[in-house]
């Protein structure tokens, strides 16, 4: 007796062939999903602006479509639905009164808030009752408020260190440091924290004195802090050493001059004394006795 899966008649089609045929029919009847795409205008949205979620390449033979808020399509997350043939718009539980759904499938928001950040799903229903979905993540940014700078000290002695911290109440921002109204050129003596909101200078030099600002920004706005003036004092020890070296050099130079002058004076006195002495008589050269008459 043959296996149960064997086909006793020549007209019988193997189950693998039926499965392949069903897969091909399903692929043939299913609407294409490659062109259903949602675009946001503007792409980066600031709090209080209007935003338009448009459907790119909307398929044909549609019966209706609906917009949902959230990662999944749930009845309680329906914003609004639209039936194409009857032009009937039906608001859902997630409708806030600021959304408008158009006959072309677009969703228009007015005066968006931070709470509008999240996923939005478009579900389209074809006339053959098949369903297709597309998702888009909307990010709403808040306008950046003015930050502030806190310094470990505003007057620092040369060769010391200072820590500058930028404070902001906004989240999702980037930090940039400004020195004398220009972007700070970070040197080997400077260290930035992971998010750049803390600047450490060690050791500090006279060239680091000036006005510092921090700038915070997000994709839709930016703001700078008030200037903070940093004063760098000279190192007293270094100044004392320099003064000591200078005074010592002057004393050594004065001593050398004194010794030279003294040596020169002694040589001059000896020369004058020699010139004032009478010449000494030579022995045996006195007056001869024979000359006396």
Curated annotation (Swiss-Prot):
Residues 147-231 form the Ig-like C2-type domain. Pfam families: Ig_3 (PF13927), V-set (PF07686). Glycans are attached at residue 111. Keywords: Disulfide bond, Glycoprotein, Immunoglobulin domain, Membrane, Signal, Transmembrane, Transmembrane helix. Residues 35-240 are extracellular. The chain crosses the membrane at residues 241-261. It is found in: Membrane. GO terms for biological process: immune response; T cell activation. It is a single-pass type I membrane protein. InterPro entries: CEA_cell_adhesion, Ig-like_dom, Ig-like_dom_sf, Ig-like_fold, Ig_sub, Ig_sub2, Ig_V-set. Residues 1-34 form the signal peptide. Residues 267-293 are annotated as: Disordered. CDD domains: IgI_hCEACAM_2_4_6_like, IgV_CEACAM_D1. Disulfide bonds join 166-214. Belongs to the immunoglobulin superfamily. CEA family. This is Cell adhesion molecule CEACAM21. The lineage of its organism: Eukaryota, Metazoa, Chordata, Craniata, Vertebrata. The gene is CEACAM21.
